[in-house]
């Protein structure tokens, strides 16, 4: 058979690496990819809901952090005003 006929030509499909960019062992589908939609969950699981007490504690901590950051910003603004006022 001539060399250009599919399936003939000695060492097989030598152009597969250039066509896919993957070596032979990575082209197989038996490692990472799933073929059936029922293999996947319908949606990602939700994180557990916070209790109201935990949410309140988290929000108060965020408020304190933001207030501290606002104070730092106010101090820096005053420093810049003093430097520019000279």
Swiss-Prot record:
Name the UniProt record assigns to this protein: Uncharacterized protein AF_2392
Keyword Coiled coil included in the entry's annotation: yes
UniProt entry keywords in alphabetical sequence: Coiled coil
Organism: Archaeoglobus fulgidus (strain ATCC 49558 / DSM 4304 / JCM 9628 / NBRC 100126 / VC-16)
Coiled-coil residues: 49-85
